[in-house]
Amino acid sequence: MDTKHQDKPSILMLPWLAHGHIAPHLELAKKLSQKNFHIYFCSTPNNLQSFGRNVEKNFSSSIQLIELQLPNTFPELPSQNQTTKNLPPHLIYTLVGAFEDAKPAFCNILETLKPTLVMYDLFQPWAAEAAYQYDIAAILFLPLSAVACSFLLHNIVNPSLKYPFFESDYQDRESKNINYFLHLTANGTLNKDRFLKAFELSCKFVFIKTSREIESKYLDYFPSLMGNEIIPVGPLIQEPTFKEDDTKIMDWLSQKEPRSVVYASFGSEYFPSKDEIHEIASGLLLSEVNFIWAFRLHPDEKMTIEEALPQGFAEEIERNNKGMIVQGWVPQAKILRHGSIGGFLSHCGWGSVVEGMVFGVPIIGVPMAYEQPSNAKVVVDNGMGMVVPRDKINQRLGGEEVARVIKHVVLQEEAKQIRRKANEISESMKKIGDAEMSVVVEKLLQLVKKSE
């Protein structure tokens, strides 16, 4: 391992092994590398292979990729499964445990590289423990929303009290979901203990991927939950890059009227059920808007796309040229910034919500799992979208409701006000982003000075 960058303070970054965590860590790494920090970016080999091309091409002198090998004591986790991507859900906590068991290998990396600071993620307080063994300061970075993180922490430290920003029935439902999550275990440790330790071990402050422009009330609630200062780092959006494969999509978009297309995507790690797929398809047709649908099926899924979609759906959209279905990866940031896009039908993963906000695209929320319902509240709080309501009894998604909300956000008179608000938020987030990053750099340099 190359350790020759002694003229700059160095940060070893260790994200959780999921796309939604690795990508924001990498964007933060790029920004810090431009502020005279040398970055060691540490992950499993297959994650580095997936994310590393852009780094090696454009940041090879300032961001160094460091492989962390997980122990081979987990036969169900071969190298291709040392990431959450395409990992069967029942193996997630096997992966959490295997990651923790890599602590000795991580200690060897620390001993060799001797970084100035360590930045770690919510799932691995053990990384902070390892850092302190070598007298290295460690900082928690949360690539999640402030609403999700504050609600999580509230349920750990104040479980019997009302969370001040949710209605009682909503809090009751989401608290049940989050308490189930908090009581899952890996290596005999409950999630709630793992997460609390992650907060407690962070040195002086905690970084979080958000902006005061959109989540000020949730950020201001943190001091009542923990001793550390919470510092927003801004949106951390990856700059769109051009690939030849994008041409077909961009050409199709360019044929459409301004703000006439809905972009539909439900993330890279959640896969809608066949029933949800049918209702989304029905809603898109009933809304009569143009649309691009980034369509993904789980790799273990036996169905084809044609079998997953309603009968005749693909033929109908091809005939009327209303829609395009794209399987697999799509240039999401590039699509969202295109002038033809008038709405974003999204699962409300935090990365997608922030991208929609930065590019000023109104959001039609279809939250499906995890913290997505809480993220959707940020969209509504800021007046830049709506959530598709589900059946109150069985939580089923309905195509008619999908169509109604799409029309409201994209086509009807109210859409003008939503678009105006989306544009205002976009401009404000861009303006405040540099100031927020300046605070991050200042805080890190304070830690560097103390470590000298």
Swiss-Prot record:
Task: Provide the Gene Ontology terms for cellular component.
Answer: membrane
| Molecular functions (GO terms) | flavanone 7-O-glucoside 2''-O-beta-L-rhamnosyltransferase activity; UDP-glycosyltransferase activity
Q: Where is the protein found, in the record's own terms?
A: Membrane
Note the topology in the membrane.
Single-pass membrane protein
Q: Which residues bind UDP-beta-L-rhamnose?
A: 268, 330, 347, 351-352, 355
Q: What residues sit in the active site?
A: 21, 121
Tissue expression, as annotated, is:
Expressed in young fruits and leaves.
Kindly indicate whether the keyword Chloroplast belongs to this entry. Answer: no
- Where do the coiled-coil regions begin and end? 407-436
Which top EC class is named for this enzyme in its record?
transferase
| PROSITE patterns given in the database record | UDPGT
Expression induction or repression: Inhibited by 10 uM UDP.
User: What GO biological process term is on the record, naming one?
Assistant: carbohydrate derivative biosynthetic process
The EC number on file is 2.4.1.236
Catalytic activity annotation:
flavanone 7-O-beta-D-glucoside + UDP-beta-L-rhamnose = flavanone 7-O-[alpha-L-rhamnosyl-(1->2)-beta-D-glucoside] + UDP + H(+)
Residue positions binding an anthocyanidin: 21
Task: Cite the entry's keywords alphabetically.
Answer: Coiled coil, Glycosyltransferase, Membrane, Transferase, Transmembrane, Transmembrane helix
- The transmembrane residues are 136-156
Give a yes or no for keyword ATP-binding in this entry: no
Q: What SUPFAM superfamilies does UniProt report for this protein, alphabetically? A: UDP-Glycosyltransferase/glycogen phosphorylase
Q: What does this protein do?
A: Involved in the production of the bitter neohesperidosides in citrus. Shows a strict specificity for UDP-rhamnose as donor.
Note the subunit structure: Monomer.
To which protein family does this belong?
A: Belongs to the UDP-glycosyltransferase family.
PANTHER family the record matches: GLYCOSYLTRANSFERASE (PTHR48044), UDP-GLYCOSYLTRANSFERASE SUPERFAMILY PROTEIN (PTHR48044:SF9)
Q: What is this protein called?
A: Flavanone 7-O-glucoside 2''-O-beta-L-rhamnosyltransferase
Give the species.
Citrus maxima (Pomelo)
